Amino acid sequence: MSQLVYFSSSSENTQRFIERLGLPAVRIPLNERKQIQVDEPYILIVPSYGGGGTAGAVPRQVIRFLNDEHNRALLRGVIASGNRNFGEAYGRAGDVIARKCGVPWLYRFELMGTQSDIENVRKGVTEFWQRQPQNA
């Protein structure tokens, strides 16, 4: 199975979700000057920012990570977290990234997710990778 790449703000909600998920994952650093580069296909897990609008929904660190053509080429899907208080903008970062990068928006969860979210994502990620061609 390929990996997960995620970003978590200082609130650590996404970090806690990843820890509970128990799957291999690499974190995009909070420090914008530090960068990572991935070497295999991955699913991105990202929080949504901005209080509900499209502008600012995707964290700057994630934009910078995806602006690296190598990283963007290996993206296979996106999972977004958000806050239901934002209404239609709940999980908007997932929609923005999926549309701009041409990958499926696989799932969204609120804040640090529920146990049901953990189970759904774990199962969904496993099934997603099983459906992918070996060299995709």
UniProtKB/Swiss-Prot annotation:
Coiled coil: none
Source species, domain of life: Bacteria
GO MF annotations in UniProt: FMN binding
Single biological process term from Gene Ontology: protein modification process
Entry-linked Pfam families: Flavodoxin_NdrI
InterPro entries: Flavoprotein-like_sf, RNR_Ib_NrdI_bac, RNR_NrdI
HAMAP family noted in UniProt: NrdI
UniProt record similarity statement: Belongs to the NrdI family.
Function: Probably involved in ribonucleotide reductase function.
Protein name (Swiss-Prot/TrEMBL): Protein NrdI
